[in-house]
Curated annotation (Swiss-Prot):
EC numbers for this chain: 3.1.31.1
Molecular function GO labels: endonuclease activity, active with either ribo- or deoxyribonucleic acids and producing 3'-phosphomonoesters; nucleic acid binding
Record text on cofactor binding: Binds 1 Ca(2+) ion per subunit.
Protein location: Secreted
Protein name in UniProt: Thermonuclease
InterPro entries membership: SNase_OB-fold_sf, Staphylococal_nuclease_OB-fold, Thermonucl_AS
Active site: R65, E73, R115
């Protein structure tokens, strides 16, 4: 009887552990693909300005606007190039052109202009956050995309404290 009870406890414990691993997709049930269904990897084929890029999606060009940041204008019609706009654009070109990036979408995937909205990851680094940290973008969020708001705002505060680029005055 004692042997059966011990065996039953071991089986129940194993079922619980495997169930938890299955629900969290860890252990032997971990997905081989992307870590999140809201993420995809693309090659950056062109940089429009500091916060807008074009990626190759299955042979088609896709215009992408980075969520949570707003860099000074450089290409907006009827708008002069704003201070640090060229620096932000050059920074993005230097880091992202011809690079494979991982895109992470939030709740709304397109803006009113039809651009894809995403967080851009270069390796393990979120590029949107990097722009704010370098003082080359202001944190700017629109409903309903707030996933990394606190993180990007913290990066901006750090740049402000250090008086980097757009915060230098």
């Amino acid at each position: 009887m004692k042997k059966i009870t011990t065996g039953l406890i071991i089986v129940v414990a194993a079922i619980i552990v495997l169930s938890i691993q299955f629900m969290t997709e860890s252990g032997p049930f971990k997905s081989a693909g992307l870590s999140n269904a809201n993420e995809q990897t693309y090659k950056v084929i062109r940089v429009i300005d500091g916060d807008t890029i074009i990626v190759d999606k299955d042979g088609k060009q896709q215009n992408l606007r980075m969520i949570g940041v707003d860099t000074p204008e450089t290409v907006k019609p009827n708008t002069p190039v704003q201070p640090y706009g060229k620096e932000a654009s050059d920074f993005t070109k230097r880091h992202l052109t011809n690079q494979k990036v991982r895109l992470e979408y939030d709740k709304q995937e397109k803006d009113r202009y039809g651009r894809t909205l995403a967080y851009v990851w270069l390796g393990k680094e979120m590029f949107n956050e990097k722009l704010a940290k370098e003082g080359l973008a202001r944190a700017k969020f629109y409903r309903p995309n707030y996933k990394y708001q606190e993180r990007i705002e913290q990066a901006q505060k750090q740049a402000q404290k250090l008086k980097k680029n757009i915060w230098s005055n």
